[in-house]
Amino acid sequence: MRADVRVEAGKIAEIGELSVQAGEEVRDAAGLFVLPGFVDIHIHAYAGADCMRGEADVRRMSEGLLKTGVAAFVPTTMSAYPEETNRALLGIQAVKDHPCEHGAAVLGAHMEAPFLCPKYKGAQLEECLCLPTVEAYENMTHGVDCVRMMTLAPELPGALDMVAYLKAHGVVT
């Protein structure tokens, strides 16, 4: 299919047979594919950067991911002590609130732990896992509002109450 694509403010505005407007930049994509940017909703690290290490690493991830076609992403934390998780979330929040000029957008954070069943923890650190409580969650998330996703084990005591709490706060479980 041959078509022109007009991009305004980083978003596709029109597709069809278009006339070039004054001052518009034109790029020839003949023989190429023009696709929307990808969204990665579960990524811990990229190109040597790890979201658990804070803002500088999240910025490196953002800038590197955009070059691969990822337009937006949800940095994913792993099991860690509460203060480490909070530090990681503060870094994610900083990049979400003040995005890189040439980077993939940070849509929020995905907390993959600590509310997991030790039996099914995968690569998560067992000593950092705990039961799902509002107190534990707020201890890790104080000062941030960037959490958008939470992986938690529904079989744990308190899990269903935690799911209701998270849903009320706009967090997908």
Segments predicted by a language model, with ranges:
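Divalent metal-coordination and catalytic microenvironments
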Residues: G10, G31, H42, L65, ...
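Histidine/acidic residue-rich metal-binding segments in metalloenzymes
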Residues: V95, C130-T173
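Short acidic, glycine/serine/threonine-rich loops at helix termini
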Residues: T85-A88, K119-L125, M162-V163
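Histidine-rich, glycine-flanked metal-binding segment
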Residues: M1-L35
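Divalent metal-dependent hydrolysis catalytic cores, especially in the metallo-beta-lactamase
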Residues: H44, R59-A88, A104-C117, V144-E155, ...
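Metal-dependent catalytic neighborhoods of phosphoester/phosphodiester hydrolases
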Residues: C51, E83-A94
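Active-site mouth loops of central-metabolism enzymes
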Residues: M1, H44-A56, G122-C130
